[in-house]
Amino acid sequence: MADHNLAHTTALLARTPATLDALLRDLPEVWTLTNEGENTFSAFDVLGHLIHGERTDWMPRAQRILQFGETRPFDSFDRMGHLRESQGKSLPELLDEFGRLRSENLDELRTLNLRPEDFDRRGKHPALGVVTLSQLLATWVTHDLTHVHQISRIMAHQYRETVGPWSRYLGVLQCAGHSADA
């Protein structure tokens, strides 16, 4: 049986919107619209991606596991779906939307009244195969942390040359991660 602590999961998930709001709101666009190069995300794009996941990924997949198990695979996730959804919106609008959607999703998650055995329930991912609800929820948290790190890395990238020789001591500039397709 999975040893999943839902309180620990929701504690972090609940903080991500405020973390991003504190980091990004009211910054000059050079910080939020600049990326790391061709085919990479800006902080604005990452936020749009997180919103798209709130709408189409985490809770819909949790519901699918609970309702259908492995008999009905998850819908594929459109990694670029955020481009349509973010078009014409401002960063403050995206920050507000992310906060609202995350709050709604966490409320929905709480109303499921999950029991310990529910975390072992299985669903089918279109690329990864069989996954458990526990794995999905742990991935949701880790996905948030990945993108908080990514936003920090994107922003640090703006000063990659300016820091001069100190770059060797700044791990965020040495990170092998990238924003392009995996």
Regions from the language model: what does each represent?
Residues 22-25, 29, 63, 67, ...:
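Charged/polar positions within long, soluble alpha-helices
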Residues 9-12, 25-26, 69, 86-88, ...:
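Short acidic/polar alpha-helix capping motifs at helix-coil junctions
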Residues 10-11, 19-21, 27-28, 85, ...:
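Intrinsically disordered, low-complexity segments enriched in polar/charged residues with Gly/Pro
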Residues 2-31, 51-64:
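Alpha-helical bundle segments that constitute or directly flank the non-heme di-iron/ferroxidase center
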Residues 16, 79-121, 131, 135-143, ...:
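Acidic/histidine-rich alpha-helical segments that form the ligand environment
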Residues 3-14, 40, 44, 91-95, ...:
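Amphipathic, non-membrane alpha-helical segments in soluble helical-bundle scaffolds
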